[in-house]
């Protein structure tokens, strides 16, 4: 047996089965595999009937389901040979398979503007004096407008005063610790839409983490586990890759949202001031409680949600359809 180590959701992944026989016999082979996605908890039993020709060695490809991302574990439940009529069977001795493969979500590039919100704590904030960033609450430098600059960067009062467009460059915070919260749910009541939502949440989580790394911003990724919260610090590409492998192996959250007390312990331990929650379910009471602890931005992934943002409450809420995320149509987010 040969199973590739990785694939991307929706792409082909196949288990290679090589059959070697001492004599060319036309007996058929019956194989049964048990597959489990550790992320979603979904189990599947796969039964394969092979009909080898007369060659001593033959290879077969068994396609596997990659509709949903996650870490898949594959075991051989039974294997044997059966006669042409399927009446008599003989099990194979000493044949086993304990394989696994990681199916990654679609990878997309997103530019994010992590601005310090009105609920953020300003105490102890410091900024890089040599590099510009995306925190528009602190000015890095003032300069003349250049082609390609966003009009959001224009300082209109100074521009009117001096007669030329003046741009306000944002600063790069050096102790502005950001947390990404995974909040995808393993509910089965949405049918096929559940796979799309899970893929979209994991795609968005990976895109935000990579976008922060590109800006030189180390950050923390948090998800629920049996003990309350699993925390990983991301400050390099190697750390990002390890985080993705871990997140795709950890079971999705139950219907209950993040435990505010568990998150508060993480927030204090890691000095978190900005939190980006990626979720497929909105729990208003829990979000209000989180917003009281941290500067909170929420990315809500919905099956049929209309794209848009709401900044009227205690946190910034952005709605994005799942198919828009996996389709790579989201290019910029202000969080």
Q: Where are the regions a protein language model picked out?
A:
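Exposed, interaction-prone extracellular/peripheral surfaces
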Residues: 48, 124, 147-335
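An amphipathic, basic-hydrophobic helix/alpha-beta surface used to engage anionic
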Residues: 1-230
């Amino acid at each position: 047996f040969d199973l590739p180590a990785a694939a991307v959701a929706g792409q082909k992944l196949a288990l290679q089965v090589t059959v070697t026989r001492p004599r060319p016999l036309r007996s058929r082979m019956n194989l049964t595999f048990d597959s489990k996605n550790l992320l979603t908890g979904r189990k599947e039993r796969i039964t394969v009937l092979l009909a080898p020709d007369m060659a001593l060695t033959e290879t077969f490809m068994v396609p596997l389901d990659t509709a949903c991302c996650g870490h898949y574990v594959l075991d051989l439940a039974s294997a044997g040979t059966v006669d042409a009529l399927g009446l008599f069977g003989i099990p194979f001795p000493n044949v086993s398979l304990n394989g696994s493969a990681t199916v990654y979500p679609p990878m997309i590039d997103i530019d994010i503007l992590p601005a310090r919100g009105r609920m953020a704590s300003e105490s102890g904030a410091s900024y890089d004096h040599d590099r510009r960033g995306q925190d528009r609450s602190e000015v890095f430098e003032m300069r003349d407008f250049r082609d390609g600059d966003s009009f959001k960067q224009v300082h209109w009062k100074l521009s009117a005063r001096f007669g030329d467009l003046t741009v306000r460059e944002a600063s790069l915070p050096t102790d502005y610790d950001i947390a990404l919260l995974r909040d995808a749910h393993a509910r089965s009541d949405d049918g096929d839409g559940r796979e799309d939502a899970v893929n979209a949440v994991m795609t968005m989580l990976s895109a935000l983490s990579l976008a922060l790394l590109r800006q030189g911003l180390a950050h923390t990724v948090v998800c629920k586990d049996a003990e309350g919260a699993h925390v990983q610090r991301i400050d390099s590409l190697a750390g990002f890759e390890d985080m993705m492998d871990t997140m795709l192996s950890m079971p999705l959250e139950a219907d209950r949202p993040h435990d505010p007390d568990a998150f508060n312990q993480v927030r204090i331990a890691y000095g978190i001031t900005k939190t980006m929650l990626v979720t497929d379910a909105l729990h208003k009471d829990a979000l209000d409680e989180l917003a009281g602890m941290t500067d909170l931005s929420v990315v809500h992934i919905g099956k049929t949600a209309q794209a848009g943002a709401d900044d009227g409450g205690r946190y910034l809420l952005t709605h994005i359809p799942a198919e828009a995320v996996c389709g790579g149509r989201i290019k910029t987010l202000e969080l």
